[in-house]
């Protein structure tokens, strides 16, 4: 049984050749946690406190705005994905504290980590959807004014959640629990039954659809958007654009270690020194990725307005100011007028 997960929502392995410490008591595990695990626990605790409160506030604000603004629909779904991910943190926290022992049973082993993965991939795909929406606002403003509606936005969000569900299915199907006796513990993880090709195929598909493809989408969309908006004075009011770019940048900075170590572990042999090192850093990489779940509300508040204004306004007011559609609509209309005027000038010249 080569593939087995200790701590992460999906990546990780069990190695039958792990060295058994003969000095370890049979009736209990070591009382000492590794340094990476301790750092992961600290990060998990901070992310849980900030992420649950912050994303709950974003959900509360955008739930009212989503009835009339498309921008709020995007951020509502993104906040829901992050909020649910943060709610699952006590599960990972408990497992690490108990030296990766899984006390929740077999059914929970299949369901709970898979739900964490679902919310993670939903967050990724929603970010790509938001970037595509921003691209259309800048380059197809007239089309957006005619066809960009709340119904279409909700459909796009449903597609993102559906694709995230498909990416999560392997985790649900291949998760099992394994009982160990030296020291006694129950491990929850993914078991591909020595099928390395299947394991690598799943890892590659998730890397492409859950990371590289969204990354390419974001890079293309925002490169063209930045070039276009900064080439015209009339479209340089980009408050929402700055917020989304900050959210996207933070996402890939914090998720990159998880993705890199995950794909490396799927191709390495469990007995290799590199694999063993990555396995020790596993919890830390997951906790680093989880920072993204709590940093988005902070970005929204900081981007709201100047420091003095932040002191004078309440948090809900600041979030409402950032997450509403007004600045986006003004930018789109401004660019549309600029495009029409340019076409008129060319017609007169002919």
UniProtKB/Swiss-Prot annotation:
Extracellular-side positions: 1-37, 94-110, 175-200, 266-282
Broad class of where this protein is predominantly found: membrane
Membrane association type: Multi-pass membrane protein
A GO-annotated cellular component: basolateral plasma membrane
InterPro entries listed in its UniProt record: Anphylx_rcpt_C3a/C5a1-2 (IPR002234), Formyl_rcpt-rel (IPR000826), GPCR_Rhodpsn (IPR000276), GPCR_Rhodpsn_7TM (IPR017452)
PTM remark: Sulfation plays a critical role in the association of C5aR with C5a, but no significant role in the ability of the receptor to transduce a signal and mobilize calcium in response to a small peptide agonist. Sulfation at Tyr-14 is important for CHIPS binding. Phosphorylated on serine residues in response to C5a binding, resulting in internalization of the receptor and short-term desensitization to C5a.
Transmembrane segments: 38-64, 70-93, 111-132, 154-174, 201-226, 243-265, 283-303
Phosphoserine: residues carrying this PTM: 314, 317, 327, 332, 334, 338
Pfam family, one: 7tm_1
Spans annotated as Involved in C5a binding: 21-30
UniProt region (Required for CHIPS binding), positions on chain: 10-18
Gene Ontology terms, MF aspect: complement component C5a receptor activity; G protein-coupled receptor activity
Residue intervals annotated with topology Cytoplasmic: 65-69, 133-153, 227-242, 304-350
Subcellular location: Cell membrane; Cytoplasmic vesicle
GO biological process, one term: chemotaxis
PTM-bearing positions, type Sulfotyrosine: 11, 14
Keyword annotations of the record: Cell membrane, Chemotaxis, Cytoplasmic vesicle, Disulfide bond, G-protein coupled receptor, Membrane, Phosphoprotein, Receptor, Sulfation, Transducer, Transmembrane, Transmembrane helix
PROSITE patterns, sorted: G_PROTEIN_RECEP_F1_1, G_PROTEIN_RECEP_F1_2
Bridged cysteine pairs (disulfide): 109-188
Family membership noted in the UniProt record: Belongs to the G-protein coupled receptor 1 family.
Subunit structure: Homodimer. May also form higher-order oligomers. Interacts (when phosphorylated) with ARRB1 and ARRB2; the interaction is associated with internalization of C5aR. Interacts (via N-terminal domain) with S.aureus chemotaxis inhibitory protein (CHIPS); the interaction blocks the receptor and may thus inhibit the immune response.
Function per UniProt: Receptor for the chemotactic and inflammatory peptide anaphylatoxin C5a. The ligand interacts with at least two sites on the receptor: a high-affinity site on the extracellular N-terminus, and a second site in the transmembrane region which activates downstream signaling events. Receptor activation stimulates chemotaxis, granule enzyme release, intracellular calcium release and superoxide anion production.
Name of the featured protein: C5a anaphylatoxin chemotactic receptor 1
Gene: C5AR1
